[in-house]
Amino acid sequence: VYINKLTPPCGTMYYACEAV
């Protein structure tokens, strides 16, 4: 399962997902 740390969706160029 992954959760996005910031507002934009997981897996974008700007924000990475953090494994949970």
UniProtKB/Swiss-Prot annotation:
UniProt keyword terms in alphabetical order: Antiviral protein
Source taxon at top rank: Eukaryota
Single GO BP term: regulation of defense response to virus
Other noteworthy facts: Has antiviral activity against Tobacco mosaic virus and antitumor activity against stomach cancer cells in vitro.
Protein name per the record: Antiviral protein Y3
Species the sequence originates in: Pleurotus citrinopileatus
